[in-house]
C-alpha cells in the first residue's frame, strides 16, 4: 500500500483540508506524488514566467492570500522505478484523475480537474491548456 513521503506530506499540508482528505483517501489505492500545494509570490511568478502556470500572482488557486491553505494541488502518478514521474503517460494521469474525482464526490467535496476545466466529462472540447495533474477546490 502506497503512502506519502516527507516531501509530499510537507506540500500537501499547505493545501486546504478538503484537498488533503481526498488525497489521503486516494494514496493507498493509486500511488502518486505531490508536485505543488501552495505557491508563494516568487514561486508563482517563476511558474508563470516559465509557462508552467497561466495565472500570475496572486490569481492562481495555488496562491493562498492572505497566507493560509492553497485551494489547489498538483499531483503526478509515481513509479518505484526511474523515471519516477512519466509526464507523457497521459492515460495514467487520466486514471488518477478518475480516482481523485470519484473520491471527492463520495466525500461531498467539489473539485475541478485540469483535464476537464468545464466539468462536462469531455476531455477533447475546450479544455485547454491541459493540466492533467491539477485539481482545485470549488468553494
Residue ranges, per PLM feature:
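Extended, low-complexity, intrinsically disordered C-terminal regulatory tails
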Residues: 24-53, 106, 114-118
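Polar low-complexity intrinsically disordered regions enriched in Ser/Thr and small residues
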Residues: 6-8, 54, 117-118, 136
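Active-site acidic/histidine clusters and adjacent loop/turn architecture
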Residues: 1-33
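Catalytic cores and adjacent binding grooves of peptidoglycan-active enzymes
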Residues: 60-139
